[in-house]
Regions:
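C-terminus-biased signal that marks the final domain/tail of proteins
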Residues: 1-123, 127-129, 221-396
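A contiguous strand-loop segment
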Residues: 54, 58-63, 79-220, 250
């Protein structure tokens, strides 16, 4: 048996502990995730049937599904990034999983996540830095429970430079190489699924096919590049502008530098930005201002649902957004008469209570966290609820 690595530790106590792994970017890509892959091999193998479950919802014919499996083995052998492809091959060998399953996970996962993200000025309750600053709150929802067991924290280091310095941190899934939720000093990032698009549906599907075949990078790979860049972080506005003009699947990208939070509403080739230095939030539906609501232009610019049955997802998204927005509005109104300054800060405990309340946190939530870009840290992290089939069953 391999020795237990000192780099694998639990961030939480008890059975709900979320493992933490150190990923050394100075190692050859094939070797970076070996310990994680060996530790999670059984759980990752248990997730493989998700591929078939998703196929069954999309394709009713068993013969056609077998054909798609055959084609997947042939064509899903790489990601766009050669570095990530090498990392993924190392994981596949160590975990004893067919590579095409991991390629499919990395190419498609970031397009199927329900999330609540945003930024708000927080009054820290502990730590050396007690100054009020913007922090980045985040819940990540996924309807398939088997992924819950793959949640991990990654701490990235470059041992060739300084093995004691963590250059970035990420909350992700074992076997997933892009960035869904991450933080480094002066930058935090999260990615939310967008339930609609304004671009041509044909253009979008073609782009998604290219991502699946490894001919275009997934959005999460582009965010990984921003998070792990060895150079100093770009200004928030510059990074937001660059990402807005980058080709990605429709999504929301949330960026925070402790001073300001920017939400990018991305379509295929362009994006629009919302910014705030007080409070801003995003779920999985578009936010419209009154000016654009009645401009009479509805043709190709009118958002279309990404997938059939998306109406329910968008309704739940609106409920989550209304909940967090209303909490901030009531808080601001309550404080308005007590504070002469326009600058408002929410207590850290209050914010945690907000984002743990239903429906912001719900039965599909895999984890909830608070990122501190000022310090480059994951300030708080907890697993989501685990709802058993017997909940609410009184035997009657």
């Amino acid at each position: 048996m391999p020795p237990i690595s000192p780099h694998a530790v639990s961030t939480l106590s008890g059975e709900d502990g979320i493992p933490k792994y150190q990923i050394d970017l100075s190692l050859p890509p094939e070797e970076r995730y070996l310990l994680l892959a060996k530790d999670f091999s059984t759980r990752m193998q248990e997730v493989v049937p998700l591929f078939d479950e998703v196929l069954e919802t999309l394709v009713s014919s068993a013969i056609l599904r077998r054909l798609l499996h055959f084609l997947a083995r042939i064509f899903l052998w790489r990601l766009y990034s050669s570095e990530e492809t090498r990392e993924l091959k190392g994981i596949a060998r160590a975990a004893n999983i067919d590579l095409y399953y991991l390629v499919a996970l990395n190419a498609a996962l970031d397009g199927l996540l329900g999330c609540t993200s945003g930024g708000v000025v927080v009054k820290p309750s502990w730590g050396k830095e007690r100054e009020e600053r913007m922090m980045h709150f985040r819940t990540l929802d996924w309807g398939m429970d088997r992924l819950r067991g793959l949640v991990v924290v990654l701490e990235f280091v470059r041992s060739a430079d300084d093995p004691g310095v963590v250059v970035a941190r990420s909350v992700t899934y074992a076997g997933f190489l892009g960035v869904l939720t991450g933080v480094r000093e002066n930058l935090s990032i999260s990615l939310n699924f967008r339930g609609s698009h304004s671009c041509s549906t044909i253009s979008l599907r073609f782009h998604q096919l290219l991502v699946l075949l490894g001919l275009q990078p997934p959005t999460a790979t582009r965010l990984r590049t921003a998070l792990l860049c060895p150079k100093p972080v770009l200004s928030l506005l510059t990074l937001a502008t660059n990402l807005s003009n980058t080709k990605t699947s429709p999504c929301y990208i949330i960026l925070c530098d402790s001073i300001e939070t920017v939400i990018i509403q991305k379509d295929l080739t362009h994006g629009t930005k919302r910014c705030s230095n007080q409070f801003v939030a995003c779920t999985n539906h578009d936010q419209y201002d009154e000016r654009g609501a009645d401009d009479g232009v509805k043709s190709n610019l009118y958002p279309k649902a990404n997938l059939a049955g998306m109406e329910i997802v968008l309704e739940e998204s609106e409920e989550r957004y209304s909940c967090i927005r209303d909490k901030w509005t009531r808080y601001a109104q309550k404080k308005a008469g007590k504070q002469k300054t326009e600058w408002l800060a929410v207590g850290e405990k209050t914010l945690k209570n907000w984002i743990q309340e239903y429906p912001i946190m719900n039965e599909c939530t895999n984890f909830v966290c608070l990122l501190d870009p000022k310090m480059g840290q994951i300030r708080w992290l907890e697993r989501g609820w685990v709802v058993s089939d017997s909940d609410g069953d009184d035997g009657s």
